[in-house]
Each structure stands twice: as C-alpha cells, then as structure tokens.
C-alpha cells in the first residue's frame, strides 16, 4: 500500500486539477487562467501553479508580472492577483530577474523546482488548485504527476484545437493519462470558430467538432468548445478579468459552462 503523504502546504487544498495539451499553441494557459477566473466567480478560492517552466505566461495574463514572492515559515507565499485574495499564483516567472530571461535548465534542476513548487508553496485554504503544465508529454509531466500523486489530484483537463494535427497530439496525451493513472476530467476544444465581437455570430475558421468526436471515441467527457474571441485575446494581453468584463460574449458563455460542468462532476470524481 502506498504511504500517505505528509499534508504540509497542500493540507488546505480540496481539489487539484491538471491542465494538459498535446502540443503548444492551443491556448492551454488561456484555459487554465479563464477556468480559475470562472471558478472564482462561482465563489471558489483558487490557486494556479504554473509549471510551464520554459514559457511562464500566466503572470502576464493576470497582470501579476514583476510581483515578488516572499518567504514565510512554511515556504514561499504565492502572489495574490486580486484584492479579495481569491486567486493566488506561483510561477517560475516570479523567480527570474528578467522576465525575458530564457530558462535553460537540465532535467534534474527542473524536476527539483517542480517538487519544490508542490511541497514548499504555502497555499493556505483553497477550493481548487489548477496546475498549468508544459505542452506535450515529457519528463516534466512525469515529475509533476509523481510529485502530486500522493495528494490524489482529481484528474486532468485536456485542451485541443479543431485541427487534425492537434487532435493526434491529444490522443497521445490521453494515452499518457492512462499510463500514469491520471483520470481525464474532460476534453476542451479551444479556438473553435471565430466569435464576432459585434454580433456574437460564430464562424468556423478551422474544421470543427474534432475535439468532441475524439472525446466520444475515447470514452471521456467533452466539456465544451471555446471560440476565438477578440475580447478574450485583448483581456489576456492587458491582464484583465475577461469573465467579469464581458459577460455577454460567446466565449464567456463557453468558459462558464465548462466551469459549471467541472463543478457538477465533483461528487463523481471524489467518490
């Protein structure tokens, strides 16, 4: 029988969710960020652990770049990104002297930081910890899953885009989840059509429906499609809360629906 982990800094975290993608450029960090914001607007207290060590973009998306990480008796204190302190964030981006500095580290150093992020960040009480992972399936993913395994993460959200290349990569991601014993909470298709900011009509730019079909064939839940939305893009670039500012947008409806589905699955996932 596997030994129980010391609860430590994750003792107050109720649910841990990983966000994965088979390839880069599909908007995985966007989904992580907006899911956290949507859960916050549902009254949940959320933390984001950014383990995308070579591409830490979430501090910029949440207008938190340049903020300092402080030490306490329990370890690192995450950065709060709102006045209510309902979203906290830890990222390697806070540890770099220059935000444009490239992270050129060998595997052992990356693995050590991932383990430190898991054990040494004083999250306090959280309803959800969203873990934004690098794209693909690599040693960093193995290190993340192994470090979190004793704390029984709920599972993974897998992000794809409609194109066939991305769908193929997601098949490999689903295989990774199966081999590592990580439950798939669901598949999210991002960049699914273009939402006009004036009339809200959604036009397919790429093929559509690939993510839903893949989820059906794999026997995992399909959580929804998020369109390309200029208002969402602008919010991320400016570090603004899209969920709060654009409640009438098509992407808002899609993102809040996904958050509702995740919340609805909680009883089954926890059983």
Swiss-Prot record:
The note on cofactor binding and number reads: Binds 4 [4Fe-4S] clusters per heterotetramer. Contains two stable clusters in the N-termini of NUBP1 and two labile, bridging clusters between subunits of the NUBP1-NUBP2 heterotetramer.
Q: Is Nucleus one of the keywords UniProt gives this record?
A: yes
* Residues annotated for ATP binding in this entry: 22-29
Query: Has the keyword GTP-binding been applied to this entry?
Result: no
Keywords on record: 4Fe-4S, Acetylation, ATP-binding, Cell projection, Cilium, Cilium biogenesis/degradation, Cytoplasm, Cytoskeleton, Iron, Iron-sulfur, Metal-binding, Nucleotide-binding, Nucleus
Q: Where in the cell is it found?
A: Nucleus; Cytoplasm, Cytoskeleton, Microtubule organizing center, Centrosome; Cytoplasm; Cytoplasm, Cytoskeleton, Cilium axoneme
Q: Which residues are recorded as modified (N-acetylmethionine)?
A: 1
Q: What are the required cofactors?
A: [4Fe-4S] cluster
GO terms of molecular function: 4 iron, 4 sulfur cluster binding; ATP binding; ATP-dependent FeS chaperone activity; iron-sulfur cluster binding; metal ion binding
Q: Which GO terms describe its biological process?
A: cell projection organization; iron-sulfur cluster assembly
Which Pfam families does this chain map to? ParA (PF10609)
What superkingdom heads the lineage?
A: Eukaryota
What Gene Ontology cellular component terms go with this record? centriole; cilium; cytosol; nucleus; spindle pole centrosome
* Gene3D superfamilies attached to this UniProt entry: P-loop containing nucleotide triphosphate hydrolases
Note the SUPFAM superfamilies from the entry: P-loop containing nucleoside triphosphate hydrolases
Binding residues annotated for [4Fe-4S] cluster, in chain numbering: 196, 199
Q: Which HAMAP family match?
A: Mrp_NBP35 (MF_02040), NUBP2 (MF_03039)
Q: How does it assemble?
A: Heterotetramer of 2 NUBP1 and 2 NUBP2 chains. Interacts with KIFC1. Interacts with NUBP1.
According to its UniProt entry, the function of this protein is described as: Component of the cytosolic iron-sulfur (Fe/S) protein assembly (CIA) machinery. Required for maturation of extramitochondrial Fe-S proteins. The NUBP1-NUBP2 heterotetramer forms a Fe-S scaffold complex, mediating the de novo assembly of an Fe-S cluster and its transfer to target apoproteins. Negatively regulates cilium formation and structure.
Entry similarity comment: Belongs to the Mrp/NBP35 ATP-binding proteins family. NUBP2/CFD1 subfamily.
Q: What is this protein called?
A: Cytosolic Fe-S cluster assembly factor NUBP2
Organism from which the protein derives: Rattus norvegicus (Rat)
